[in-house]
Amino acid sequence: MEQYTANSNSSTEQIVVQAGQIQQQQQGGVTAVQLQTEAQVASASGQQVQTLQVVQGQPLMVQVSGGQLITSTGQPIMVQAVPGGQGQTIMQVPVSGTQGLQQIQLVPPGQIQIQGGQAVQVQGQQGQTQQIIIQQPQTAVTAGQTQTQQQIAVQGQQVAQTAEGQTIVYQPVNADGTILQQVTVPVSGMITIPAASLAGAQIVQTGANTNTTSSGQGTVTVTLPVAGNVVNSGGMVMMVPGAGSVPAIQRIPLPGAEMLEEEPLYVNAKQYHRILKRRQARAKLEAEGKIPKERRKYLHESRHRHAMARKRGEGGRFFSPKEKDSPHMQDPNQADEEAMTQIIRVS
């Protein structure tokens, strides 16, 4: 066992190397560094920087006091822990394959800023541990220049928003690792909702181009149009959970301007064009505010009662006095009764 002691102005550090493991202890704070193979360690307590060199292909685990865990596989790593105001901690880690440093800034109460995909465990206000898992695609490197990196800002421990406009809504997990509810909204406008969370609830999505599909894993995917205003659309899709795990989808057409008023029946082309002109004139007067938009059911109550009492034929047409007196327009029941009377008389 070999022991090395280095004296500095601020504190005394002791590095113990035994069986390929290195442990470093400092006064006032504990920093444990564990290696599986031999490595060279350079420590500077004034700046609190630990530089570790590891053989290619060997795993490295650096555990910093405060519950943070950083892992790397076979790459030189430099961890710089700088304490800030109000208990803030800033750590810099080199990104594999690039020349820049990856900076992680932790703000304990509720705001977290992360660049890159990491798994961070934070302590909630009620004492429950919350786990945030953020994944990003592999960063492309061209001519030594890294493409735009994903920046994620979590505020209030409820919503995570990236630089590309992607919004991630997360909720705390239980002790056994089960997620209560997970909703992912990518940039393409696709929403994935677990089918189990739809029990006893109704989800209404507006939009004429709304597409809803269900997969075999018990999830429901709703695709919404990205561009355009989906509020002023011509349709509404309602998902109502049924007896099974897959909710039923119902499309309800919204009434337009032409569906509010009933089309008159049995009119010729001249009458129809005249009706269209009257509707345009009425719409113009309603827009100017000269006439009310609400129309009364009838103009005179006496005429309405008289029209409702009149007999109507096929298609709702009224019988004229001439048609009513004609023999071929008589009631078929009355004609049958007269025929039976004639048969009885003949017999």
From Swiss-Prot:
InterPro entries: CCAAT-binding_factor_CS, NFYA. Residues 296-321 bind DNA. The modification Phosphoserine is found at residue 326. It is found in: Nucleus. Residues 299-310 have a biased composition (Basic residues). Transmembrane segments: none annotated. One of its GO terms (cellular component) is nucleus. It comes from the Eukaryota. Keywords: Activator, Biological rhythms, DNA-binding, Nucleus, Phosphoprotein, Transcription, Transcription regulation. A motif (Subunit association domain (SAD)) lies at residues 266-289. PANTHER family: TRANSCRIPTION FACTOR NF-Y ALPHA-RELATED. This is Nuclear transcription factor Y subunit alpha. It comes from Homo sapiens. The lineage of its organism: Eukaryota, Metazoa, Chordata, Craniata, Vertebrata. The gene is NFYA.
